C-alpha cells in the first residue's frame, strides 16, 4: 500500500438511497474516467454519462464530475461518479474501477488526510469535517462549520505569529547584550508576553466552550434516596426514562440521558441514592454513583425540601460536600416545592446556585434548564464560535504553562535562554493544533476515526 496509489471509496452511507457516490483521487483518476466513461468530462461541470463495464455494457448512468488537481478537495485529480444508490449497482461499479491497475480502496479518512498533506486544509479544519458530520445539534453543526472555514485556525495562527515576533525580540536581547538598547528596561518583552498570555486565555476559554458543545456537559444528579432524582431525570428528558416509586433505593444503577437545551448537548446522569448500602447490589450502585460524580462537569445536589429547611449545601449534608472533588460546580436543587409551598426560582447561597422546583409537576424545571445552558457559557449568540477537541485543549493548556514559566524567568533572574526555550515550546504546542508540527502517529489516530469516503 502506497500513499501514491489512486484511491476509491463510496462517499455515501451504505444501504439503499436515491443517489450513490464513488470518489476517486490520484494520478489514475484520469484513466478511470476515460475507461469507465469513455471520455474525460469537462472540468467542474456535471456531465450525464453511462458508466460502462469492461465489455462495454452499461452498469449504470449518472453524473460525472471531474476536478483536475491541484484545484480539488485533495489537491490531486479527483473524479466523482454519482449514480443510483442501490448497493448492488455501486458494488459492481466499484469492482469495475478496481480492475484498473494501481487503484485500491481508501483507508478511513484518507481523502481528508491527502487534503491536509497537500496543504488544502490544516489539521484543525480536517478534524472539523468529521465533527460536522457527527454534529448532534444545529449549534454544534454551525460551530463545526466555523472551524472548517478556519475560525479556530485563525485564532491559533495569530498566537503563533505573535510568539514568533516575541521570540525574535528575546533572541535579539540574548545575541546582542552589549547594544545600547536595553531590551528589558523598556518593558516591551514583558508587555508583548502579557498580551500573548491574555490572547491565549481568551482562546482557551472559547475552546473549552467548543469542547463542551462537541462532547456535551456531563451533569450528575446526586443526593439521598427518594429525593426525586429519577423524577428530575424524567422531567429534563421529557419522557419516562427512569422508574419512579415511593420506595427509597429504587434506582440501583446509573441511568443516562442525552438531551439538548437550545442546541446545547448535555449528558444527564441519574445515580443511586447515597447512604449506607443495605446489600451488595446497592453498594455497587453507590460506588458507581461516586465514580460518575468524580468525572462530572457539574453536580445537581438533589434535596428533598420536605426533610429540611436548610439551603446551604454544607449545612444540609456536610459529609457529602466534603467528599466532592475540589472546584466541582454544584447546583443545589430543592425539590418538592409543590408540597412545601416554597417560591419557585433561582437564587444563590455561599457561591452555589440554588433552585427551587417540583420535579413531579415540572414547575421550575425550565429555570433549571436555563441555568444549565448558562453554566455552559452559551447564554449568548455563539455563531462565531468553534468546536474544539480534547487534544486541542491539552495543547492550549501546555502552551499556557510554558508561557507562565517563561514569564517567571523574565521577572526573576532573566535567564534569556530559558525564556526563549519556553516560548519555543509554547509555539510548538500551538502548532500541533493546526498540524504545522505533529507526528505521523497522531495523524494516523486522527484520520482513522473518519468515514471511509472522507
Curated annotation (Swiss-Prot):
Family statement: Belongs to the TRAFAC class TrmE-Era-EngA-EngB-Septin-like GTPase superfamily. TrmE GTPase family.
Subunit structure: Homodimer. Heterotetramer of two MnmE and two MnmG subunits.
Gene source species: Escherichia coli O1:K1 / APEC
Subcellular location field: Cytoplasm
HAMAP family: GTPase_MnmE
Cofactor: K(+)
Record-listed K(+) binding positions: 226, 245, 247, 250
Top-rank lineage group of the source organism: Bacteria
Cofactor note: Binds 1 potassium ion per subunit.
Binding site for (6S)-5-formyl-5,6,7,8-tetrahydrofolate: 23, 80, 120, 454
Keywords: Cytoplasm, GTP-binding, Hydrolase, Magnesium, Metal-binding, Nucleotide-binding, Potassium, tRNA processing
Protein's recorded name: tRNA modification GTPase MnmE
Amino acid at each position: 500500500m502506497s500513499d501514491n496509489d489512486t484511491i476509491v471509496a463510496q462517499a455515501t452511507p451504505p444501504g439503499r438511497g436515491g443517489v450513490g457516490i464513488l470518489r476517486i483521487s490520484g494520478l489514475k483518476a484520469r484513466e478511470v474516467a476515460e475507461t469507465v466513461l469513455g471520455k474525460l468530462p469537462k472540468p467542474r461541470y456535471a456531465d450525464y454519462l453511462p458508466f460502462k463495464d469492461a465489455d462495454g455494457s452499461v452498469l449504470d448512468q449518472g453524473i460525472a464530475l471531474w476536478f483536475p488537481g491541484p484545484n480539488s478537495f485533495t489537491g490531486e485529480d479527483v473524479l466523482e461518479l454519482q449514480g443510483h444508490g442501490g448497493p448492488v449497482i455501486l458494488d459492481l461499479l466499484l469492482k469495475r474501477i478496481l480492475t484498473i491497475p494501481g487503484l485500491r480502496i481508501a483507508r478511513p479518512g484518507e481523502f481528508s488526510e491527502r487534503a491536509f498533506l497537500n496543504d488544502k486544509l490544516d489539521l484543525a479544519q480536517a478534524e472539523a469535517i468529521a465533527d460536522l458530520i457527527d454534529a448532534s445539534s444545529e449549534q454544534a453543526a454551525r460551530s463545526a462549520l466555523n472551524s472548517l472555514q478556519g475560525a479556530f485556525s485563525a485564532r491559533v495562527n495569530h498566537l503563533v505569529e505573535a510568539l514568533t515576533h516575541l521570540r525574535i525580540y528575546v533572541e535579539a536581547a540574548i545575541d546582542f547584550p552589549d547594544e545600547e538598547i536595553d531590551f528589558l528596561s523598556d518593558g516591551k518583552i514583558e508587555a508583548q508576553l502579557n498580551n500573548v498570555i491574555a490572547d491565549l486565555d481568551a482562546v482557551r476559554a472559547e475552546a473549552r466552550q467548543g469542547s463542551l458543545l462537541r462532547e456535551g456537559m456531563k451533569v450528575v444528579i446526586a443526593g439521598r434516596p427518594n429525593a426525586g432524582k429519577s423524577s428530575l431525570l424524567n422531567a429534563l428528558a421529557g419522557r419516562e426514562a427512569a422508574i419512579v416509586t415511593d420506595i427509597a433505593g429504587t434506582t440501583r444503577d446509573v441511568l443516562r440521558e442525552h438531551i439538548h437545551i437550545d442546541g446545547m448537548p448535555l449528558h444527564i446522569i441519574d445515580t443511586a441514592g447515597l447512604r449506607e448500602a443495605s446489600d451488595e447490589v446497592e453498594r455497587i450502585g453507590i460506588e458507581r454513583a461516586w465514580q460518575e460524580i468524580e468525572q462530572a462537569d457539574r453536580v445537581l445536589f438533589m434535596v428533598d425540601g420536605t426533610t429540611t429547611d436548610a439551603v446551604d449545601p454544607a449545612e444540609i449534608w456536610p459529609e457529602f460536600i466534603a467528599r466532592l472533588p475540589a472546584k466541582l460546580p454544584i447546583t443545589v436543587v430543592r425539590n418538592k416545592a409543590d408540597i412545601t409551598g416554597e417560591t419557585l426560582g433561582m437564587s444563590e447561597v455561599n457561591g452555589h446556585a440554588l433552585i427551587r422546583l417540583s420535579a413531579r409537576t415540572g414547575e421550575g424545571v425550565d429555570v433549571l434548564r436555563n441555568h444549565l445552558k448558562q453554566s455552559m457559557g452559551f447564554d449568548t449568540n455563539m455563531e462565531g464560535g468553534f468546536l474544539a477537541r480534547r487534544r486541542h485543549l491539552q495543547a492550549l493548556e501546555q502552551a499556557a504553562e510554558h508561557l507562565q514559566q517563561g514569564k517567571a524567568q523574565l521577572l526573576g533572574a532573566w535567564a534569556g535562554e530559558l525564556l526563549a526555550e519556553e516560548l519555543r515550546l509554547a509555539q510548538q504546542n500551538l502548532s500541533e493544533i493546526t498540524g504545522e508540527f505533529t507526528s505521523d502517529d497522531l495523524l494516523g489516530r486522527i484520520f482513522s476515526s473518519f468515514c471511509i469516503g472522507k
